[in-house]
Amino acid sequence: MAAFVDTNILIYAFVGDIKGSTAKPATADSLIARLIQEDALIVSTQVLSEFSANAMRKGSPPLTVQQTSRLVKTFAAQTVLAVDASLVQLALQRVEQSRISYWDALIVEAAIRSGATILYTEDMHPGTRYGQLELRNPFL
């Protein structure tokens, strides 16, 4: 089953929890490893960009450019959905309909377009459905 993964899950898996918890990184790492093994990981260009920017400035120590680049190549071997103007328009409509933030709406619309049935995130309400897409928080 294909699953879209939000940026924060990748950050926990590969950078860790800047607050020092080990539970979230272990859970995120296990989830990402399973999805990659099953060839079921989906991300968007937005997720790759956010991951890259945050991975190189968060964590102790932050990831290097080379480490970040290797991880992006790993993710790119999976399914990567490009954010384009039509997706931005759909996200704007979603903001108006659902009253969620623009960035969350863009993630939701990318996940829907990708055909994913699950969106793993901790930033939105778990259990919420948008058509066939269900939001899940892997840490609950």
Where are these regions (language model features)?
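Short, well-structured N-terminal submotif of metal-dependent ribonuclease cores
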Residues: 1-43, 57-66
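Anionic group-transfer/hydrolysis microenvironments
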Residues: 8-10, 14, 46, 52, ...
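Generic alpha-helical structural signal
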Residues: 25-29, 69, 73, 89
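Active-site-proximal, substrate-binding regions of enzyme catalytic domains
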Residues: 46, 52-79
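Active-site neighborhoods of divalent-metal-dependent phosphate/nucleic-acid chemistry enzymes
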Residues: 77-119
